[in-house]
């Protein structure tokens, strides 16, 4: 049975000030808890590992893209302190937020109650992110930030095109536009926003 996983890393996280890092971690943790409640029917589980890496898993791939876009738009909508804004690399955080990979494949172990995720899906999404990482590099070059991985090559090719288009559109969104997108993806209408 195919599950869906999302592996993501926060772009330019090491360039952020300590206060901003802690605030972002807290806000992401809050979002992951909210998503666990909202998507409890598909056993959504999300966690932050190594400070700037996010891992999520769910029993159904149906909502994987929505969850990835919720993460991306939510993180892009976070305001940073003025001190952090002065760092040149922070512009990458503001433009892209996170780099995320969705994988649809089996998981050999998925125990959301104990936080255990193991299997092909988490390896595929994790490798996609690790392969595209910009950490420990002198110059940051970010081309794409949304990826799809599947054992089915035909399926992967179809989704990669869609993901590239979504990536280009969302990367152009401002902080406020990202916030509005987040609320729309959360199911709110214009009046509620």
Enumerate the predicted regions with their spans:
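Regulatory and interdomain segments flanking nucleotide-handling catalytic cores
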Residues: 1-192
């Amino acid at each position: 049975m195919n599950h869906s996983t999302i592996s993501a890393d926060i772009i330019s996280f090491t360039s952020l000030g300590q206060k901003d890092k802690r605030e972002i971690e807290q806000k992401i943790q809050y979002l992951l808890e909210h998503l666990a409640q909202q998507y409890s029917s598909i056993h959504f589980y999300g966690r932050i590992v190594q400070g700037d890496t996010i891992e999520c898993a769910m029993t159904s791939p149906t909502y994987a893209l929505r969850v990835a876009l919720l993460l991306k738009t939510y993180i892009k909508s976070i305001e940073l302190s003025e001190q952090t804004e002065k760092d040149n690399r922070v512009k990458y955080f503001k433009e892209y937020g996170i780099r995320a990979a969705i994988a649809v494949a089996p998981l050999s172990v998925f125990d959301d109650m104990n936080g255990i995720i193991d299997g092909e899906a988490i390896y595929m999404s994790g490798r996609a992110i690790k392969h595209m990482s910009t950490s420990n590099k002198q110059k940051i070059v970010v081309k794409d930030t949304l990826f799809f991985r599947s054992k089915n090559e035909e399926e992967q090719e179809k989704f990669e095109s869609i993901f590239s288009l979504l990536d280009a559109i969302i990367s152009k969104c401002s902080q406020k536009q990202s916030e509005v997108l987040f609320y729309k993806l959360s199911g709110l209408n214009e009046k509620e926003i």
